[in-house]
Amino acid sequence: MVREEITGSTQTLEWKCVESRVDSKRLYYGRFILSPLRKGQADTVGIALRRALLGEIEGTCITRAKFGNVPHEYSTIVGIEESIQEILLNLKEIVLRSNLYGVRDASICVKGPRYITAQDIILPPSVEIVDTTQPIANLREPVDFCIELQIKRDRAYHTELRKNSQDGSYPIDAVFMPVRNVNYSIFSCGNGNEKHEILFLEIWTNGSLTPKEALYEASRNLIDLFLPFLHTEEEGTSFEENKNRLTPPLLTFQKRFTNLKKNKKGIPLNCIFIDQLELPSRTYNCLKRANIHTLLDLLSKTEEDLMQINSFRMEDGKLIWDTLEKHLPIDLPKNKFSL
């Protein structure tokens, strides 16, 4: 991780891809930028994303191979240049792309003399090979060569205890990690109180997905990891609070919604997410539990609808409307939630 001083200024938080290239079928590279971040935030985001990219993204691998009656993995088969162990190592390197779940079967069945590559693997419809030229074995003589394979989708790195097989079936240490490497750099910008940080993130993948796809999946995994905290029910609500919550004045947002639609600045209501309103976490969580994600969702509700949301109170309604008045550059009607 590198820190450098650079000059620059960014007004709103945004991310973008500043470089993308394909070095080979099994090596993709992407460079991304996120800014502006307050001091310390770049490190927090960089560490979390790096861990998620390397350990939380699923990949598809060959996890087992069955050769027939072969006593151990160091055995050789007549007419084949490689030992069983070398073939297993070659199978381990095969890069697959799929969205399958569970275990799937695949196979190789060819006749020599010839080179066997990844292209010779007979796969289920949901799986494809990233690089069909990857070598597996070299048949020097006119012999039949058949292998039964197992394919699985998982994450991280799995090893299995090896022992002499009775039926010629051997596990393959699978690396379910489509992201090969991740680096991040932090750059400081601005002066005095205006100082902020810019995060640069570099991602290398094995070709089964692009760096942009990997970044998206890692971000989703991090969000899912914190969702249980957002769904935690508030404890200790008093009887008076519950009573007040059940007896609100039943006004609607309809006039306000109409006013917003007539807004000259043309605010896309379905593109404004409630997390952009900077609501308190308790109010925000109430709305999210009710599947209210955008300003369009919110303004389509009546006050009666909102008051039916678990833990939603009159104070929340007034706070929401005050927030809209504060952040939206439009003239809003004066009627609000009354306390």
Curated annotation (Swiss-Prot):
Plastid as a keyword of this entry, yes or no, is yes
Instruction: Report the Gene3D superfamilies cross-referenced here.
Output: 5' to 3' exonuclease, C-terminal subdomain, DNA-directed RNA polymerase, insert domain, RNA polymerase, RBP11-like subunit
If you read the UniProt record, what top EC class would you report for this enzyme, in one word? transferase
EC code(s) of this entry: 2.7.7.6
Looking at the Swiss-Prot or TrEMBL record, what is one Pfam family this protein matches? RNA_pol_A_CTD
User: Region Alpha N-terminal domain (alpha-NTD): what ranges?
Assistant: 1-233
* MF terms in GO: DNA binding; DNA-directed RNA polymerase activity; protein dimerization activity
Catalyzed reactions? RNA(n) + a ribonucleoside 5'-triphosphate = RNA(n+1) + diphosphate
GO terms of biological process kind: DNA-templated transcription
User: Where can this protein be found?
Assistant: Plastid, Chloroplast
**GO CC terms for this protein?**
chloroplast; DNA-directed RNA polymerase complex; mitochondrion
| Main subcellular location of this protein, as a coarse class | plastid
What span is annotated as the signal peptide, if there is one? none
What UniProt keywords are attached to this protein's entry?
Answer: Chloroplast, DNA-directed RNA polymerase, Nucleotidyltransferase, Plastid, Transcription, Transferase
Region annotation Alpha C-terminal domain (alpha-CTD): where it falls in the sequence = 264-339
**Could you give the subunit structure recorded for this chain?**
In plastids the minimal PEP RNA polymerase catalytic core is composed of four subunits: alpha, beta, beta', and beta''. When a (nuclear-encoded) sigma factor is associated with the core the holoenzyme is formed, which can initiate transcription.
Q: What does this protein do?
A: DNA-dependent RNA polymerase catalyzes the transcription of DNA into RNA using the four ribonucleoside triphosphates as substrates.
The domain-related comment in the record is: The N-terminal domain is essential for RNAP assembly and basal transcription, whereas the C-terminal domain is involved in interaction with transcriptional regulators and with upstream promoter elements.
Give the family per the record.
Answer: Belongs to the RNA polymerase alpha chain family.
Q: What is this protein called?
A: DNA-directed RNA polymerase subunit alpha
